[in-house]
From Swiss-Prot:
The gene is msrP. One of its GO terms (molecular function) is metal ion binding. This is Protein-methionine-sulfoxide reductase catalytic subunit MsrP. Mo-molybdopterin binds at N71, Y74, E75, C129, T164, N216, R221, S232, I233, K234. Keywords: Metal-binding, Molybdenum, Oxidoreductase, Periplasm, Signal. InterPro entries: MsrP (IPR022867), OxRdtase_Mopterin-bd_dom (IPR000572), OxRdtase_Mopterin-bd_sf (IPR036374). The lineage of its organism: Bacteria, Pseudomonadati, Pseudomonadota, Gammaproteobacteria, Pasteurellales. Binds 1 Mo-molybdopterin (Mo-MPT) cofactor per subunit.
């Protein structure tokens, strides 16, 4: 993993490339009518967490209000500020996370167990959106492999499938097809079992020392730092181990633009924009824009490249 330095972290820029797909589906009038909100204030009413601090404590992080105020979470609207606005009353307790499928030991975690079942630790990761913007985030959580080891995958298990909560009464984007970007909910993502078992793959329940804010995927989300952000599914209620590969949400919506693997790759462009460089979200104002080269696997090439040995990454994007 390439060591992060202060220059890896972010000046601010508003970048709405994903809105192009909204236009492609005839939803531009609705999307552009949505309000833009200022960056969220740092939250003081979220649960403080007990966790092992990262040894990378000298790193300068993306400001908390940018991480909590600049989000893609289409269940709460397609505008970057919509999730912070529309999710502010989202109820995450009680919560159930069901783990099942091709496992010997299916089980369920309640809200409190999300924070206590496994020891929590801080992981400072790069975060790269497919829209070509980036952050550095101090996630708090536990390795997904710990949860999978408890479930004991069977020999048939090849994929790990994740489902976001389906609750149209709380999630306006699920209730209104246009407000939610034309997605067929619930949101579904998946990893190969090898990807899911990798030590970098995190189940996050917090950031900046506190429980996740609703707009960041409370109470529990996936974080896969070498993949584009849409793979890091939010507000998960079900994890199913499967013998067959599912069709994931963005792959189903636009398969020519969003592949199953979604590995960060500067040599494989999105059909409508380059992935060779990225804009960073950080402490500066709108005029302090910084662009930096995109790193293969988002800087985690040494750790994860072996997972894709022999795989054509241009075809399997």
């Amino acid at each position: 993993m390439k060591k992060l330095i202060s220059n890896d972290v972010t000046p601010e820029e508003i970048f709405y490339q994903r809105r192009k797909i909204i236009k492609a589906f005839g939803l531009s009038a609705v999307a552009t009518a949505l309000p833009t909100f200022s960056f969220a204030q740092e939250s003081s009413d979220l649960k403080a967490l007990e966790y092992k601090k990262s040894t990378e404590s000298t790193l300068i992080l993306t400001p908390e209000n940018k991480v909590t105020g600049y989000n893609n979470f289409y269940e709460f609207g397609v505008d970057k500020g919509s999730p912070a606005h529309y999710a502010k009353n989202f109820q995450v307790n009680p919560w159930k996370l069901d783990i099942g499928g091709e496992v010997e030991n299916p089980f369920t975690l309640n809200y409190d167990q999300l924070f206590t079942q496994f020891p929590l630790e801080e992981r400072i990761y790069r975060f790269r959106c497919v829209e070509a913007w980036a952050m550095v985030v101090p996630w708090i959580g536990f390795e997904l492999n710990k949860l999978l080891e408890k479930a004991k995958p069977t020999s048939k298990a090849k994929y790990v499938v994740f489902h976001t909560l389906y609750d149209p009464e709380q999630m306006p984007g699920q209730k209104n097809h246009f407000f939610g970007g034309g997605i067929h909910y619930p949101y579904v993502e998946a990893l190969t079992l090898a990807e899911a078992m990798h030590s970098l793959t995190l189940m996050s329940v917090g950031l900046y020392g506190k429980a996740l804010a609703p707009q960041n995927g409370a109470p529990i989300r996936l974080v896969v730092p070498w993949k584009y952000g849409f793979k890091s599914i939010k507000s998960i209620v079900k994890i199913t181990l499967s013998e067959t590969r599912p069709r994931t949400t963005w792959e189903s919506l636009a398969p020519n633009e969003y592949g199953f693997y979604a590995n960060v790759n500067p040599k494989v462009d999105h059909p409508r924009w380059s992935q060779a460089s990225e804009r960073v979200i950080g402490a500066g104002g709108l005029l302090s824009v910084k662009r930096q080269p995109t790193l293969m696997f988002n800087g985690y090439e040494r750790e994860v490249a072996h997972l894709y040995k022999g795989l054509d990454l241009r075809i399997n994007y």
